[in-house]
C-alpha cells in the first residue's frame, strides 16, 4: 500500500517556491504505483486521504489495517524547523527557504508490531536510494533539529526511527516512511519536481520491493531441512521441486 502523505486540506510543508508538499507526494506516489505495477506488483494500492491532519492519520491507519496489505509505505517530502528558514523573493512574493540540508531519509517505528520486517524493507530501500547516487539527510541526529531530532539506526544508508509516528506505530503490517528529498532546499526542490528524479526514486522503490518479496518467498532453511516421511524416499537435490513464485 502506498500512502500519499498529508491531504488536500492539510497539505504538509510548503516548498521554497510556495508549492504544497501534498502535490509533490501525490505525483511521486503515482509514479511509484506505475513502476510497481509494471514490475509485476499488480496489487499495489494508492491511499489518498481527505480531512485535517489528525483525523487523516486515524483514517489512513484504519484503511490500512482493514486491507490485506503486506507492506505500508508512506511517501513524503522534507522541510526544516521554522527557526532555520531564511527569506527570499520569488516571482514577486516573499517566501522562505533553507539550502542548509538536503537528501532523503527512511523511517520506521520500533513500536510497530512488525518492526523487524519494517526495518528489513527500510534497509533495502535506503540502499537502493544510495545505489542511485542519492545522499541521505544527516541532520536528524543534530540538536539543532529540536523536537525533530531522532536516533539513526543505520549511519551508512540513512534509516531513522520515529517510534511515536502514528502511521508507523499503529499499522498492523510492516510500515516504512520515505522522505524523498527536501523541497525547502531551492535546488533540490527543482530536482524533486522533475520526471527524472521521480523515475530514480520510483525505480529504487521497485528494486527494494523485488528484493524484499524475493527474500520473503525464499524457503526457510529450517523448513527445507525437515525430514521427509519414512514411507517416501528423500528427493535427490536435482529432483527437488523449485519454490513457486509468490504473486505480488
Task: Write out the residue ranges for each language-model feature.
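Active-site-proximal helix/loop segments of hydrolytic enzymes
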Residues: 23-248
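Short glycine-rich His-centered loop
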Residues: 1-18
